[in-house]
């Protein structure tokens, strides 16, 4: 009995899927920070904020916060628009002079030119070769994510691209995950979300999906939410886990 318990603990630590957990048919991917490296924007955002490198994370969290304000007030704006507005807010609250044109220049072009993390292409290729349907599910606009994938060389890996622009509800609104499931023609049990954000994992799990947290630098899980099925450091690591 002790041996069996020990094996179960080992499997759990390795992220090995339980036998009664169905293999996902569709894998949804968050985009910004999960697949694409936001650090490349640091120089333009830092310059716009008067050299304040420490305000980069505040800007991104402010952008996410106000996307949820749009959900609540039902006044949808694109992620790029919210990003510009959030940068202006952070600048004003820290007494940095910044015009709307300067904020847009610091965000829009760099956001559409983010490079993929080093592990991404190999991981996506392995998952695609294993037969999984790969779909991006992003808070970015339809045109925005298309341009991002073109510039990052990721277009060919995905079977489809879904944007919250079509439902006008930002993640982690449960309706967004439910809409994605209906659009993909699968049940929650047949789908998995991969994300580097605790709030996205929380939303996916609450909607009934399987979830994998990819631990990008500085990213942590929300401890009060349902736990992800897996926690990995790279996409090839996830591909190995799912290759049962």
Each PLM stretch: what is its role?
Residues 1-4:
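Positively charged n-region of N-terminal signal peptides that target proteins for export
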Residues 16-18:
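Boundary at the C-terminal end of the N-terminal hydrophobic targeting segment
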Residues 20-64:
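Active-site neighborhood of HAD-like aspartate-dependent phosphohydrolases
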Residues 22-24, 121, 125, 141-142, ...:
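Asp-based, Mg2+/Mn2+-dependent phosphohydrolase catalytic module
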Residues 42, 56-60, 80, 84-88, ...:
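An amphipathic alpha-helix signature
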Residues 67-105:
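A metal-dependent, Asp-based hydrolase signature
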Residues 80-81, 100-136, 146:
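Short, acidic loop-to-helix structural element flanking the phosphoryl-transfer center
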């Amino acid at each position: 009995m002790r041996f069996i318990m020990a094996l179960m603990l080992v499997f759990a630590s390795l992220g090995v899927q339980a036998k009664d957990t169905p293999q996902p048919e569709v894998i949804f991917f968050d985009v910004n920070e999960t697949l694409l490296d936001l650090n490349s924007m640091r120089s333009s955002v830092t310059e716009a904020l008067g050299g304040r490198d420490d305000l980069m994370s505040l800007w991104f969290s402010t952008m996410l916060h106000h996307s949820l304000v749009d959900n609540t007030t039902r006044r949808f704006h694109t992620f790029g628009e919210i990003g510009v507005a959030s940068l202006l807010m952070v600048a004003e609250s820290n007494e940095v002079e910044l015009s709307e044109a300067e904020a847009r220049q610091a965000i829009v072009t760099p956001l559409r030119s983010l490079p993929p993390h080093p592990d991404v292409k190999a991981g996506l290729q392995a998952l695609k070769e294993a037969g999984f349907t790969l779909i991006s599910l992003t808070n970015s606009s339809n045109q925005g994510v298309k341009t991002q994938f073109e510039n990052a060389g990721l277009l060919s890996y995905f079977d489809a691209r879904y944007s919250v622009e079509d439902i006008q509800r930002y993640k982690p609104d449960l309706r967004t995950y439910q809409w994605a499931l209906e659009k993909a023609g699968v049940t929650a049990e047949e789908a998995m979300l991969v994300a580097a954000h605790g709030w996205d994992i929380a939303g996916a799990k609450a909607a009934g999906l399987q979830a994998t947290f990819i631990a990008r630098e500085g990213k942590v899980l929300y401890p009060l939410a349902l736990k992800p099925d897996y926690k990995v450091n790279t996409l090839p690591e996830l591909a190995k886990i799912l290759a049962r």
